[in-house]
């Protein structure tokens, strides 16, 4: 903040002095400074917030001779503005009034109401419903590092659900492990942040990185910090953690304590993830396969969007977690597949389960908001609604013979706190307000004193009307009214002409106490009216006070049952994911994959899950299924390599991606888009498909390609699956060919992994003669009348052409350019055959085709059209042999007429 230091030699108001003092302690955050019904921002904070939020920038007072910039947002709409600021990378310190203004006045007329920061709002510490995506986890991640050996670990927490995990990592895996979790915020020690070895990773992550003092990550003090946070005397029940893991856990907890100030979100005990338990997918592969987001950052078009049939927020998050971290143990994958199989076999029951699941709110997030003091009556209502749905699901499953995973989930649901569920049902009204301060959320009959206070508060109009009638009868003034305003409270009002009955005698004056004289009226009160007003006011305050006490009581009970509530919610998510994957499998015709520890990779009639659905939505031609068999050719052998050649637009990239996606789906525990699938678990998946540059880091498309290819060749092992597309195309032809050639040889001899390698270098097909595990396959095409028809079928063999000119024609290049390209191609091919290619280049007339008259397109005759229409109307898959023979005779007859 410029020009706002506390030592500035200028007289400021006490309020502004207070602001500057608080801001000095929160220099890295925008300060939301509470003033009445607004959060105000000043100085540079105001300028930044005004631009980010599109709100008016005004001014308040002067500092160093210049106006102080100011802007503000209403308290009731603060969440909407916080959402925009967080999305733009800002952190916000929320400063509230922590004493009543009346208390401040007791210290003197110029005393300022005490204020303090009650919370730091950062991307990784959100709990508000408006600020969170229901289908996406909101992780805060901390990186721990030990001195000396530099060992690394990551701990990640979603305070909106209580999820807490930790795992060791290494410098070469660090970026991949971070991107797998995809945290909203990464907290690192400031010493690590400036480390030359790690800094490139932090630069890639950008604004999400938050450096913090190294003392927060002290592994020696971690045990005490963990014990204090979880309120335990020993960590014996937490399992064993390494020093870097303790450092990461300490950093994560310390940052939560720092941002939540006095609140303590209820977290699960940290769960350790073991190395190798999940499929390693490097960041480039994760991006190119568009698992959770497309290359443009959108959810639509991603694999997650294509397979998501969940109906709850928790289920959507669990599905995303499984997709981004597929398992590598067949023993762990099988129970998930068993769950989907059971759901498919019990479709009627599963439909009933999904109807119940649709009524399940986000219980873990409601619980977290309640625990940190940001919850409301509707969060308690969410728990009650969730308990009701869970009870319905438990009833539906009563007596059902379930597979292991679903049986464990049912057990967790049955252990939910039934007593607390009944308590909520008795206590909460049917219609709940958003804010607890609005009252009205406690059911009538739950608390007798509350009912009494409400009656007095709500029946005040009837009581006042009765008193007004008594005063009219007593004074004889028929126009007498009892009214109310915020200044006088309740008062009696009569016209000036009628005031004599209330002022002419001493008895009347003592009875009716004069309060105010207006131009045409006079206002009075009575002891009786004042006492009634006090009772009414106190009744409203007392009713709200009782309700708030009940709210706190219910909240405390909810937090006390946090573990069982979260366990039940997690179980409901398991049922949601299992039934959703069953719906997907039934809807799309997926099969159960056979997953084991072998090196097999045999996909029969595989399809691309995203492209297939897109074609169906567009009512286009159906997706062409293809086989892929990378299994060892003999027992004990290594996986195979397929060298794929074929034209542009032939479907090579789609084929490559679909096999990688099938492996991911199988290992996450889903059925797969294929006729059958036998997959030996993949431990590392690498994909280099599609071209992109990295201009910000000074890297060309070719350089990016080489860096990613190097990572693959250096890390792939026999259980890996490698997908490579067009390696070497970004440089001179012979350079590219030699790099691609050497890469395939290395994959075959050194990595010995299963691989799909697509290329336009047809010379590489000769490798099949020297590499025993390499097979040539190609994308089939048909040529007809100078046109090429892409069949999108994979077949054994090799392509001898790329059909680039035909693709250029389909893309809409001017006919003159296409004709010129065809002439150049023919002469280059002839020159290559005769060894005179360079001389022929010089002999080509310079774009002479531009001078040629473009040939008119042939007119289609009616008879030709009749024949074409007849062919187009054929559905080959639906014809019997007899019908096909009859059709051949008919077409021959039409052809004869033509």
From Swiss-Prot:
Entries under Gene3D superfamilies matching the protein: 1.10.1420.10, 6.10.140.430, DNA repair protein MutS, domain I, MutS, connector domain, P-loop containing nucleotide triphosphate hydrolases
Keywords per UniProt: ATP-binding, DNA damage, DNA repair, DNA-binding, Nucleotide-binding
Is DNA-binding found in the keyword set?
A: yes
Task: Name any one GO molecular function.
Answer: mismatched DNA binding
Q: Where does ATP bind?
A: 646-653
- GO CC aspect terms: cytosol
InterPro entries found in the cross-reference section: DNA_mismatch_repair_MutS (IPR005748), DNA_mismatch_repair_MutS-lik_N (IPR007695), DNA_mismatch_repair_MutS/MSH (IPR017261), DNA_mismatch_repair_MutS_C (IPR000432), DNA_mismatch_repair_MutS_clamp (IPR007861), DNA_mismatch_repair_MutS_core (IPR007696), DNA_mismatch_repair_MutS_N (IPR016151), DNA_mismatch_repair_MutS_sf (IPR036187)
- Give GO BP annotations, semicolon-separated: mismatch repair
User: What are the TM regions of this chain, as residue ranges?
Assistant: none
Question: Which Pfam families does the protein's record reference?
Answer: MutS_I (PF01624), MutS_II (PF05188), MutS_III (PF05192), MutS_IV (PF05190), MutS_V (PF00488)
Q: Write out the similarity annotation.
A: Belongs to the DNA mismatch repair MutS family.
Q: Which HAMAP family does this entry report, sorted A to Z?
A: MutS (MF_00096)
Give the matching PANTHER family: DNA MISMATCH REPAIR PROTEIN MSH1, MITOCHONDRIAL, DNA MISMATCH REPAIR PROTEIN MUTS FAMILY MEMBER
Q: Which NCBIfam families match?
A: mutS1, PRK05399.1
Entry function: This protein is involved in the repair of mismatches in DNA. It is possible that it carries out the mismatch recognition step. This protein has a weak ATPase activity.
| Name of the protein | DNA mismatch repair protein MutS
Task: Name the species this protein comes from.
Answer: Brucella ovis (strain ATCC 25840 / 63/290 / NCTC 10512)
């Amino acid at each position: 903040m410029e020009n706002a230091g506390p030592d500035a030699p200028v007289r400021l108001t006490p309020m502004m002095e207070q602001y500057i003092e608080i801001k000095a302690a929160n220099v890295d955050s925008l300060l939301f400074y509470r003033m009445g019904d607004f959060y105000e921002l000043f100085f540079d904070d105001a300028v930044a917030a005004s631009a980010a939020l599109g709100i008016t920038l005004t001014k308040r007072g002067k500092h160093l001779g210049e106006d102080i910039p100011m802007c503000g947002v209403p308290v009731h709409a603060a969440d909407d503005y916080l959402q925009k600021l967080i999305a733009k990378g800002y952190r916000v310190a929320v400063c509230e009034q922590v004493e009543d203004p009346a208390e401040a006045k007791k210290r003197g007329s110029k005393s300022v109401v005490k204020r303090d920061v009650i919370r730091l709002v950062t991307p990784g510490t959100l709990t508000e419903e408006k600020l969170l995506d229901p289908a996406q986890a909101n992780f805060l991640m901390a990186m721990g590092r030990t001195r000396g050996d530099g060992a690394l670990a990551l701990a990640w927490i979603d305070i909106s659900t209580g999820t807490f995990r930790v795992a060791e990592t290494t410098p070469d895996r660090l970026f991949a492990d971070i991107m797998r979790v995809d945290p909203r915020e990464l907290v690192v020690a400031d010493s690590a942040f400036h480390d030359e070895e790690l800094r490139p990773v932090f630069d890639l992550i950008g604004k999400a990185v938050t450096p913090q003092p190294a003392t927060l990550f002290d592994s020696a003090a971690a045990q005490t910090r963990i014990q204090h946070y979880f309120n335990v005397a020993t960590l014996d029940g937490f399992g064993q953690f390494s020093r870097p893991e303790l450092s990461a856990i300490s950093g994560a907890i310390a940052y939560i304590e720092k941002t939540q100030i006095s609140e303590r979100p209820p977290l699960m005990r940290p769960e350790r993830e073991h190395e190798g338990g999940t499929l390693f997918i490097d960041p480039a592969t994760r991006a190119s396969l568009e698992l959770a987001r497309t290359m443009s950052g959108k959810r639509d078009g991603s694999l997650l969007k294509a397979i998501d049939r969940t109906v709850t927020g928790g289920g959507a998050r669990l599905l995303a977690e499984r997709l981004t971290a597929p398992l590598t143990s067949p023993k762990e994958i099988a129970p998930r597949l068993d769950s989907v199989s059971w759901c498919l076999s019990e479709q009627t029951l599963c439909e009933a389960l999904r109807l119940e699941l649709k009524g399940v709110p986000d219980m873990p997030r409601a619980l977290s908001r309640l625990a940190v003091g940001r919850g409301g009556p509707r969060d308690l209502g969410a728990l009650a609604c969730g308990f009701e749905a869970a009870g319905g699901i438990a009833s539906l499953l009563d007596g059902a013979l379930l597979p292991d995973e679903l049986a464990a989930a049912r057990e967790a649901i049955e252990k939910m706190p039934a007593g607390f569920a009944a308590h909520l049902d008795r206590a909460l009204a049917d219609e709940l307000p958003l804010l607890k301060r609005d009252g009205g959320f406690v059911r009538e009959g739950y608390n007798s004193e509350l009912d009494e206070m409400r009656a007095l508060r709500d029946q005040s109009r009837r009581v006042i009307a009765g008193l007004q009638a008594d005063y009219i009868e007593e004074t004889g003034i028929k126009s007498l009214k009892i009214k109310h305003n915020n200044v006088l409270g309740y008062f009696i009002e009569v016209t000036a002409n009628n005031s004599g009955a209330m002022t002419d005698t001493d008895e009347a004056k003592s009875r009716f106490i004069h309060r105010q004289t207006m131009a045409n009226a006079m206002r009075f009160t009575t002891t009786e009216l004042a006492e009634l007003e006090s009772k009414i006011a106190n009744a409203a305050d007392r009713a709200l006070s009782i309700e708030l006490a009940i709210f706190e009581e219910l909240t405390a009970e909810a937090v006390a049952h946090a573990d069982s509530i979260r366990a039940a919610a997690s179980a409901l998510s398991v049922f949601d994911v299992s039934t959703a994957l069953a719906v997907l499998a039934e809807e799309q015709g997926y099969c159960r994959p056979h997953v084991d520890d072998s090196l097999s990779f045999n996909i029969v009639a595989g399809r691309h899950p995203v492209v297939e659905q897109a074609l169906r939505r567009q009512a286009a031609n159906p997706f062409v299924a293809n086989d892929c068999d990378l299994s060892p050719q003999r027992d004990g052998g290594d996986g195979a390599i397929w060298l794929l050649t074929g034209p542009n637009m032939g479907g090579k990239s789609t084929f490559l991606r679909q096999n990688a996606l099938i492996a991911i789906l199988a290992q996450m525990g889903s059925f797969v888009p294929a006729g059958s699938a036998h997959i030996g678990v993949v431990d590392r998946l690498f994909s280099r498909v599609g071209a992109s540059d990295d201009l910000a880091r000074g890297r060309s498309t070719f350089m990016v390609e080489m860096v990613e290819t190097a990572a693959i060749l250096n890390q792939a092992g026999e259980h890996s699956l490698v997908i490579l597309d067009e390696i070497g195309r970004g440089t001179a032809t012979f350079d590219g060919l030699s790099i691609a050639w050497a890469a395939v040889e290395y994959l075959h001899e050194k990595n010995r992994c299963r691989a799909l390698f697509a290329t336009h270098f047809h010379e590489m097909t000769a490798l099949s003669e020297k590499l025993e595990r390499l097979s040539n396959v190609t994308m089939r095409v048909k040529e007809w009348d100078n046109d090429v028809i892409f069949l999108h079928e994979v077949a054994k063999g090799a392509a001898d052409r790329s059909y680039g000119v035909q693709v250029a024609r389909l893309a809409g290049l001017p006919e003159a350019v296409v004709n010129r390209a065809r002439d150049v191609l023919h002469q280059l091919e002839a020159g290559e055959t005769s060894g005179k290619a360079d001389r022929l280049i010089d002999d080509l007339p310079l774009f002479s085709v531009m001078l040629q008259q473009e040939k008119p397109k042939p007119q289609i005759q009616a008879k030709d059209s009749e024949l074409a229409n007849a062919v187009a109307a054929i559905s080959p898959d639906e014809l019997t042999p007899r019908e096909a023979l009859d059709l051949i005779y008919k077409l021959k007859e039409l052809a004869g007429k033509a």
